């Protein structure tokens, strides 16, 4: 990978159990692109799911987005983002046929199937694939400045990664259809 798209830190939790235990914290690390998810992100998440599943010391996974970088003088501060969806520029650079296998072999399904609890710590935008990643987690915690949405319809697509099914299970058919068909966004207050 050309950049470290996922920073992983396993933190030991003192007194968590007689045998000890750790929390694996995964930070989506593309703040310059609002933590947009690319094929390298998918590979890294799937690799970490395999690692965590086989490590009995890890008790829980927390997924979060890297905070925005401080701009150079005169630069504009980017908003915070958990993950602003798929990195569309990768589709344009590599072509959809080269990128499609990474998205079809779904990393979100690997998160969903983990036997250990998963927590999405959402601060800022969780759009498209970012919402789908959060939906794949067992628990979602969002700051008051978070926004969730499924804007894929604006590209002539429907949400992938289990987004329509998981969203429908959580908020019902009517609200899911409203979000999916309009590309609308909801605040953390409305979403949670």
Where are these regions (language model features)?
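Glycine- (often His-adjacent) and acidic-residue-rich active-site loop
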Residues: 43, 57, 65-110, 126, ...
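Phosphate-coordinating loops and pocket residues in cytosolic domains that bind phosphorylated ligands
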Residues: 36-39, 84, 93, 181-182
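Conserved residues at the C-terminal ends of beta-strands
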Residues: 29, 64, 94, 143, ...
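Terminal peptide-recognition signature
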Residues: 26, 30, 44-45, 63, ...
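Conserved CoA-thioester-binding segment of acyl-CoA-metabolizing enzymes
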Residues: 1-72
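Crotonase-fold acyl-CoA enzyme core
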Residues: 110-192
């Amino acid at each position: 990978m050309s950049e470290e798209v996922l920073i992983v830190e396993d933190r030991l939790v003192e007194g968590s159990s007689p045998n000890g235990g750790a929390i694996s914290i995964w930070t989506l690390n593309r703040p310059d692109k609002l933590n947009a998810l690319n094929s390298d992100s998918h590979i890294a998440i799937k690799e970490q799911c395999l690692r965590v599943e086989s490590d009995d010391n890890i008790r829980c996974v927390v997924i979060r987005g890297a905070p925005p970088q401080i701009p150079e003088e005169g630069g504009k501060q980017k908003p915070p983002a958990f993950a602003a969806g798929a990195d569309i520029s990768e589709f344009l650079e590599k072509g959809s046929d080269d990128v499609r296998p990474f998205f079809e072999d779904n990393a979100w399904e690997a998160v969903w199937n983990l036997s250990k609890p998963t927590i999405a710590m959402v601060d800022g935008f969780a759009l498209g694939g970012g919402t789908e990643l959060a939906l794949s987690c067992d628990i979602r915690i969002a700051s008051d400045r978070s926004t969730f949405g499924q804007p894929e319809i604006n590209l002539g697509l429907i949400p992938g990664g289990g987004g329509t099914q998981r969203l429908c299970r959580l908020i019902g058919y009517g609200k899911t259809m409203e979000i999916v068909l309009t590309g609308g966004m909801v605040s953390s207050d409305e979403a949670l």
